[in-house]
Amino acid sequence: GVKPTYGGVSRYGLLAFASSLDQVGPFANSVKDAAIVHEVIGGFDPLDSTSIKEAPSPFTDLLGQGINNLKVGVIKELMGGIDGISDEVIARANEAVTALSNAGAQVEEVSLPAALYCLSAYYLIAPAEASSNLSRYDGVRYGLRVDGNNLNEMNINTRTEGFGDEVKRRIMLGTYALSAGYYDAYYGKALKVRRLLAENFADLYKDYDVLLSPTSPCTAFKIGEKVSDPMTMYVNDVCTIPSNLVGHPAISVPFGIGSDGMPIGIQILAPPMNESVMYQVAETLEQAGT
């Protein structure tokens, strides 16, 4: 699965959840297929105000060229710095590091200090934006309408039936974070973490072509298995949130199977508008993992 550079793929026609975070990217059976689809759907769209006018380089150009002398940074905070990360996941991530090194890349451990605070920051920023964006779905102007005896009852009925439990939970979190007396204490601090994270990434990308981490601290869980445990689902976002907060591209590549028979993913992160190198490294990782 691919998360492109923020603004690299048009979001026109998309339901907005968190406007500064929402992105569209492909799922595919191979890195090459993902790159091809990305080339097709990417590019400037005047109907999307966040769309980047800069033309991206073809994402398939570097496929098959190897990764000799590319510099890869392994984010230590997302390896051993996560509470509860699976030993199996760490082992597979270390195997991925070895595979890239054997393929000619220069692989080194790096530090991304702000990554330790990203999970908390994300679950303040995203729900806050969702609370604002989804307030328009009142049954009058957009979307589903459920009748009531008066306007207030119609609004309540519409939002009660139109939003699932997780959406309601995030709206409540966001409304609380934006409420008087809590904005500076929570939302304002989350934005500071976001700025600090962007600075951390900028410093790393001065010296490294891409970064590497696990995709998740555990193997994939089955669909619906954790629905009643939202905190577990939130915590499993810890590795993928950093690139999303700053709008940088990232790709998750399957790299082995855990003892429970479920897949383990390795994530490659890249500087904005530099997906071609990201795909180049991901292809090497894909070949090593098959």
At which residue positions do the language-model features occur?
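Short, solvent-exposed loop/turn segments at secondary-structure boundaries
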Residues: 84-89, 121, 225-227
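N-terminal beta1-alpha1 cap of cysteine-dependent amidohydrolase-like domains
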Residues: 80, 90-93, 97, 107, ...
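General small-molecule cofactor/ligand-binding pocket signal
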Residues: 106-111, 251
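Alpha-helix boundary/capping residues
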Residues: 40-44, 125, 137-141, 149, ...
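Short low-complexity, flexible loop/linker segments enriched in glycine and/or proline
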Residues: 121-127, 227-229, 266-268
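Structural helix-boundary/capping segments
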Residues: 1-83, 91-103, 172-199, 207, ...
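Serine-dependent amide/ester hydrolase catalytic core
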Residues: 78, 114-118, 138-245
